[in-house]
Amino acid sequence: MSIQTDDFSEQRVIAATPASANEEAIERALRPKQLDEYVGQEKIRGQLEIFITAARQRREALDHTLLFGPPGLGKTTLAHIIAREMGVNLRQTSGPVLERAGDLAALLTNLEANDVLFIDEIHRLSPVVEEILYPALEDYQIDIMIGEGPAARSVRLDLQPFTLVGATTRAGMLTNPLRDRFGIVARLEFYTPLELTRIVTRSSSLLNAPIDEDGAFEIAKRSRGTPRIANRLLRRVRDYAEVKGNGDITKAMADAALVMLDVDPVGFDVMDRKLLEAVLFKFNGGPVGLDNLAAAIGEERDTIEDVLEPYLIQQGFLQRTPRGRIATPVAYAHFGVTAPQTGPNGELWGGQ
């Protein structure tokens, strides 16, 4: 019996993307509503607090804002917080949904003064829709075509001032003209275990799941620096604690639940180990090209780049080089394998 790798990757308990519509609904219930409730991303939060306060005092729309970074770090949450802090409405859509210029025009013409338009996956906007967006962002105007053939004519419509908040995991795929029209650009970073501990503690309170600090930290340190994963693991650990114990989440209870879920102490699951083992044992530590690596583990190259690699690189287990991916000494140590004295390129580890 064959296993579809796409289905398998979607079922990962430590996947940074929402697993279902039900999970998205739970996420909405757990989201902070205001900046002072938002944990982590201190630099971005401080900047937004100043920019939002200034825009509110001037009674102007906030500058167009681009939020980028790996999935699950809070881009959608920040978009909702921006709208709430500005005291305006939020209209939400995504790049793939806006197939025709008319789809975007309908959204823009229904915005009220200073409203927030949130476009997720903005890097996937079609070129036709993107062209319509440029004058809307700069001049709050759009040009639409009325009629067809020789009788067709262009009509310019004035829009209310608004704020576009774009979110993307692939900032490099944005066109330069679109990127240049954002006045505020913020990169979201992975969270520290202490920040995630605060998030887990807050979420457990909202879920009425008793948890101690050690239990929260045990979940946090295995959450790959990602709040979405932390909240998902918390819900699974809560289930385990209610069935196997009295419902209280302690360090021992959290550890037992996470072992059952096959999430190891650094947050790796079978897919992470599969990737690192391929680099270490199939390709002798690398360098290995992305296409070869994708074929070796049966995953799409986009999944490797967007989902698997960011955390492995950030934690120092994997390194990107011009010649391909290579395993670091940290990866060798994690699997209990002696690292070679020289790197895969024949250079000493740690050398220039």
Swiss-Prot record:
GO terms for biological process: DNA recombination; DNA repair. ATP binds at residues 30-31, 72, 75-77, 138-140, 181, 191, 228. Mg(2+) binds at residue 76. Residues 265-352 are annotated as: Head domain (RuvB-H). Residues 192-262 are annotated as: Small ATPAse domain (RuvB-S). The keyword Phosphoprotein does not apply. It is an enzyme of class 3 (hydrolase). It is found in: Cytoplasm. Residues 5-191 are annotated as: Large ATPase domain (RuvB-L). Its main location: cytoplasm. It catalyses: ATP + H2O = ADP + phosphate + H(+). DNA binds at residues 301, 320, 325. One of its GO terms (cellular component) is cytoplasm. Its EC number is 3.6.4.-. GO terms for molecular function: ATP binding; ATP hydrolysis activity; four-way junction DNA binding; four-way junction helicase activity. SMART domains: AAA. The keyword Zinc does not apply. Keywords: ATP-binding, Cytoplasm, DNA damage, DNA recombination, DNA repair, DNA-binding, Hydrolase, Nucleotide-binding. Belongs to the RuvB family. Has 3 domains, the large (RuvB-L) and small ATPase (RuvB-S) domains and the C-terminal head (RuvB-H) domain. The head domain binds DNA, while the ATPase domains jointly bind ATP, ADP or are empty depending on the state of the subunit in the translocation cycle. During a single DNA translocation step the structure of each domain remains the same, but their relative positions change. The RuvA-RuvB-RuvC complex processes Holliday junction (HJ) DNA during genetic recombination and DNA repair, while the RuvA-RuvB complex plays an important role in the rescue of blocked DNA replication forks via replication fork reversal (RFR). RuvA specifically binds to HJ cruciform DNA, conferring on it an open structure. The RuvB hexamer acts as an ATP-dependent pump, pulling dsDNA into and through the RuvAB complex. RuvB forms 2 homohexamers on either side of HJ DNA bound by 1 or 2 RuvA tetramers; 4 subunits per hexamer contact DNA at a time. NCBIfam families: PRK00080.1, ruvB. Homohexamer. Forms an RuvA(8)-RuvB(12)-Holliday junction (HJ) complex. HJ DNA is sandwiched between 2 RuvA tetramers; dsDNA enters through RuvA and exits via RuvB. An RuvB hexamer assembles on each DNA strand where it exits the tetramer. Each RuvB hexamer is contacted by two RuvA subunits (via domain III) on 2 adjacent RuvB subunits; this complex drives branch migration. In the full resolvosome a probable DNA-RuvA(4)-RuvB(12)-RuvC(2) complex forms which resolves the HJ. This is Holliday junction branch migration complex subunit RuvB. It comes from Herminiimonas arsenicoxydans. The gene is ruvB.
